[in-house]
Amino acid sequence: MTTTPTKPTTPVIFAGHMVYTHRFESGRTGSRFLRELRDNKKIMGLKCSKCNKVYVPPRSTCKECFSQLDKWVEVGSEGKLLTYTVLRVARDAEKDVLKKQLPVAYGIIKLDGTDTGFVHMLGEVDLDNIKIGMRVKAVFREDERKGNILDINYFKPVSKSRKR
């Protein structure tokens, strides 16, 4: 069989905007994590029985030794800010979810008792005063919690006058 080459054509490009509804299923591990946030204001992690790593958010398999994780542990609601970024422009979909005034800061937080970073918003902080290494703590929603990650409103700086 032979084919006859065709003359190349210029691609047609259509510019546009598409909005769609997305639903994320959190699975067995994620569901327990979210239920504890909603019902008890507790941040739970999964601990590896072989290498003792604690994961938040929890995962079902240890990324270090590939063991199945099934030992739930409560971790602290405070931790250390590992890094951060400031969002100054949001896409339309983000504006609906955040319902916050821009700019907004996001951080990766290593919660006390964990070995992993946890991404969340930072609040009650001047953006010019955010420092890597600063201590932060979770601020939970006081109104109806819904069983999603936004049951933690944000993480705020821990008062410097607090004794350790």
Kindly label every feature range from the protein language model.
Residues 54-55, 69, 88:
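Cys/His-rich microdomains that often coordinate metals
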Residues 84-90, 143:
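Short, conserved beta-turn/loop elements at beta-strand boundaries and strand-helix junctions
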Residues 41-44, 58, 75-77:
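Short metal-coordination and nucleic-acid-contact micro-motifs, chiefly zinc-binding Cys/His arrays
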Residues 49-52, 66:
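Cys/His-coordinated zinc-binding microdomains
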Residues 103-118:
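Short, basic/aromatic beta-hairpin or loop at an interaction surface
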Residues 2-44, 153-157:
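A broadly conserved sequence feature marking short terminus-proximal activation segments
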